[in-house]
Amino acid sequence: MSKRDYYEVLGVNRDAGDDEIKKAYRKLAMKYHPDRNPDSKEAEEKFKEAKEAYEVLSDAQKKGAYDRYGHAGVDPSMGGGGGGQGFEGFADAFGDIFGDLFGGRGGGGGRSNVYRGADLRYNLEISLEEAARGAEKTIRIPTVEECGTCHGSGAKPGTQPKTCPTCGGAGQVRIQQGFFSIQQTCPKCHGTGRIIPDPCGDCGGAGRVKKQKTLEVKIPAGIDEGMRLRHSGHGEPGVNGGPPGDLYVEIHIRQHPVFERDHDDLHCEMPISFATAALGGEIEIPTLEGMARIKIPAETQSGKVFRLRGKGIKNVRSHTHGDLMCHVVVETPVNLTERQKELLREFEEVSKGDAERHNPKAKSWMDKVRDFFAT
């Protein structure tokens, strides 16, 4: 007798996702499980059929072979539908469905849960110069390591952990809830399958101790605020042989007294005197490489921006550099002597006749005023 199509068995389309397949199987398994239908041969066959279909369609490799070649593409030894092995318990039928809820897959007694270690984050503050040029920094991070006294067993030297009497070493226990026999983490050993009657005095039975670890961090030139550097394997160690987590170093750049950063560009104010702005001249300005000279043309107005190309910050992902933007600030003189005040009064007096020619913004402003009152 030929087998029915697995998608037809579960009542799903061929493009159904994992969640839809799992939901369909769960519905059929609850309906036809032998624990609920002890005297029904038909229910037994339908349960076996649904289970076989689910074991193929829930496995990406088997599903791919089935989609290409049909039943002939699925190795019978991997199908899991043979009747000679007997039936699993109700919770075992739903092991992968309830695994996320109750800490592990059903039917896997005796296996300790393996977990990846937690990731760590370290906030590192650096100067703008260090961000621009790159740097190497030494940091100390809190971590946990295997206890050197008990070598990770958690037991006092000369003693050994014992098999948990509650779960018999399985790490999980079954709880009957109506029709369901649910498997969950053992409350006594917390899933390890062992208990420690005589804990290690240095780690308190944890098998791990807190330490400070020194690490060299290489900061690439051009790194920006909030960027993170990943150091694989420098997080907390895994559990039961699991891989360690990662360390993420998050960069924070201190405020600079002169420069403000905008991506790869730098901005700074460039104060100049009233006379230099009017007559022109040459002044020194700071850059990250040192002082540079810049020519100020006559009649320069406050707010004008001078761009120094390539004097910004190197892009962290390329060899290009940003620019340095110098914003002119014409300073009003203060603490004037009587002679200086007298000269300014003379300048004001001789400028009265053609003030608009000497003050372009004032001329523009007066034009707006005249237009306003003319309407």
From Swiss-Prot:
GO MF assignments: ATP binding; heat shock protein binding; unfolded protein binding; zinc ion binding
Any GO BP: response to heat
Zinc finger (CR-type): 134-212
Entry's cofactor comment: Binds 2 Zn(2+) ions per monomer.
Binding residues for Zn(2+) 2: C164, C167, C186, C189
The keyword RNA-binding is assigned to this record: no
Occurrences of domain J (ranges): 5-70
One Gene Ontology CC term in the entry: cytoplasm
Record-linked PROSITE patterns: DNAJ_1, DNAJ_2, ZF_CR
InterPro entries per UniProt: DnaJ (IPR012724), DnaJ_C (IPR002939), DnaJ_domain (IPR001623), DnaJ_domain_CS (IPR018253), HSP40/DnaJ_pept-bd (IPR008971), HSP_DnaJ_Cys-rich_dom (IPR001305), HSP_DnaJ_Cys-rich_dom_sf (IPR036410), J_dom_sf (IPR036869)
CDD domains: DnaJ, DnaJ_C, DnaJ_zf
Main location: cytoplasm
HAMAP family the record matches: DnaJ (MF_01152)
Function statement: Participates actively in the response to hyperosmotic and heat shock by preventing the aggregation of stress-denatured proteins and by disaggregating proteins, also in an autonomous, DnaK-independent fashion. Unfolded proteins bind initially to DnaJ; upon interaction with the DnaJ-bound protein, DnaK hydrolyzes its bound ATP, resulting in the formation of a stable complex. GrpE releases ADP from DnaK; ATP binding to DnaK triggers the release of the substrate protein, thus completing the reaction cycle.
Subunit structure: Homodimer.
Name of the protein in its database record: Chaperone protein DnaJ
Lineage of the species this protein comes from: Bacteria, Pseudomonadati, Pseudomonadota, Betaproteobacteria, Rhodocyclales
Gene designation: dnaJ
